[in-house]
Regions:
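Structured segments of extracytoplasmic/periplasmic soluble domains
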Residues: 1-8, 37, 88-96, 123, ...
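Alpha-helical metal-binding/catalytic segments enriched in His/Glu/Asp
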Residues: 1-27, 160
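His/Asp/Glu-rich mid-to-C-terminal helical/loop segments that flank catalytic regions of hydrolases
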Residues: 3, 131-178
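Generic anion/oxyanion-binding catalytic loop in active/binding sites
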Residues: 7, 109, 149
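Surface-exposed patches in mature extracellular/periplasmic domains of secreted proteins
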Residues: 7-11, 96-104, 171-177
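Proline-rich low-complexity regions
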Residues: 12, 41, 126, 173-174
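Glycine- and acidic
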Residues: 16, 67-71, 141, 145
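Metal-dependent peptidase/peptidase-like ectodomains
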Residues: 22-129
């Protein structure tokens, strides 16, 4: 499908890698392996958009009866430009509440360090971690597919796609913070 779109002139200007890794719960093993053995040199990696748990809502938002949100973590830590691209994609299209509650270096949950984007960030690759927050089934066998909110995951995935699409079609790569 992607090759057909590219052949018809609708492809991105830059390459995209869709990377599925495992071993997160055992110490981010898959992403640690990848950054040591990347398909392309990490210096050529513009950004890492990490989607880790985006199909549900957390207890906080459930109690407020708010569904159209996503936690955004780390977007401006290495590149303010990346954060602005994400905000613009959201304001222009998806209009989710971007919740930065966990985007504080002193957050006791330390979510910034607990998902696969972290190995990229440690290697100076700008990241965004998209997360729906913890819920009662977090890291339990009871976290089953029937509990996914498919219209919501679609909207959140659209935000990730639109951010990625802007990144791969810009005339210049995003700049790192000084």
């Amino acid at each position: 499908i992607f090759q057909k779109a590219k052949n018809e002139g609708n492809g991105p200007k830059r390459s995209m890698i869709f990377l599925n890794v495992s071993g997160e719960e055992k110490g981010l093993l898959g992403s640690a392996f990848y950054v040591k053995h990347p398909f392309v040199p990490l210096k050529n990696t513009v950004a890492n958009l990490n989607i880790d748990m985006i199909g549900r809502t957390d207890n906080k938002h459930d109690s407020l009866k708010i569904k159209d949100y996503i936690y955004v973590i780390g977007a401006d830590r290495l590149s303010n430009e990346l954060s602005e691209i994400n905000k613009k994609a959201n304001s222009d299209f998806t209009k989710l509440e971007l919740d930065y509650t966990y985007d504080n270096s002193s957050d006791p949950n330390k979510y910034y360090q607990r998902s696969d984007h972290y190995n990229f960030a440690k290697n100076n690759v700008p990241i965004i971690f998209y997360f729906n927050g913890a819920h009662d089934d977090y890291h339990k066998p009871t976290d089953t597919p029937d509990k996914i909110d498919f219209p919501l995951i679609k909207k959140r995935a659209q935000l990730v796609f639109l951010t990625a699409w802007e990144l791969v079609n810009r005339s210049e790569r995003i700049k790192l913070n000084k």
